Amino acid sequence: MSRYRGPRLRISRRLGDLPGLTRKISKKLSPAGEHGQQLRKPSEYSLRLEEKQKLRFNYGLSEKQLSKYIKIAKKVTGSTGLILLQILEMRLDNVIFRLGLSPTLPAARQLVNHGHILINKQKVSICSYQCKPGDIIDVQAKDSSQNLVKRYLSFPTLVGIPNHLELNTKTLNAKINAIVERESVALQMNELLVVEYYSRK
């Protein structure tokens, strides 16, 4: 299954607030669908599936990518759910978004893909690059890069900059101070249900 490229607001209405996916908030109270969905008690499977979908759509991942990250997280000592979130949060595209250098994750992905971002003075155009403590992030010095990011910074942010990141808005220079903590993850979801979903496949 490839990365979703359809209407973002429809997904947000179905799954709830996904800060990485869209800045828009639906004014409709009914869930997505022609007449909304009938309210009924969800099954355990549907609950696990919904949490998995939240993760996939918020971080803009394909099913194959998310499955790969689950396998990586399971090989690391510790809570698989927390490690999974840390892997996703430390992706370069997500770090750019959490710093406020872009209004959404899709916009952050474009900044990275188009070569606007430097890591430790080297251009990195791979969105999945795993940032680590000590990394220095800069915006390219050329006017097109600087002006685009400055325009993005003028947008009101949906979530604040987490404690493990710091940003100088004048120089457009940022630093990663630590691995993200669970309480700094902006997405409201239950990562344990995602681990259960893949464990039962």
Swiss-Prot record:
It is found in: Plastid, Chloroplast. One of its GO terms (cellular component) is chloroplast. GO terms for biological process: ribosomal small subunit biogenesis; translation. GO terms for molecular function: rRNA binding; structural constituent of ribosome. Signal peptide: none annotated. SMART domains: Ribosomal_S4, S4. It holds the Pfam family S4. Residues 90-153 form the S4 RNA-binding domain. The keyword ATP-binding does not apply. It comes from the Eukaryota. Transmembrane segments: none annotated. Keywords: Chloroplast, Plastid, Ribonucleoprotein, Ribosomal protein, RNA-binding, rRNA-binding. NCBIfam families: PRK05327.1, rpsD_bact. One of the primary rRNA binding proteins, it binds directly to 16S rRNA where it nucleates assembly of the body of the 30S subunit. Part of the 30S ribosomal subunit. Contacts protein S5. The interaction surface between S4 and S5 is involved in control of translational fidelity. Belongs to the universal ribosomal protein uS4 family. This is Small ribosomal subunit protein uS4c. The lineage of its organism: Eukaryota, Rhodophyta, Florideophyceae, Rhodymeniophycidae, Gracilariales. The gene is rps4.
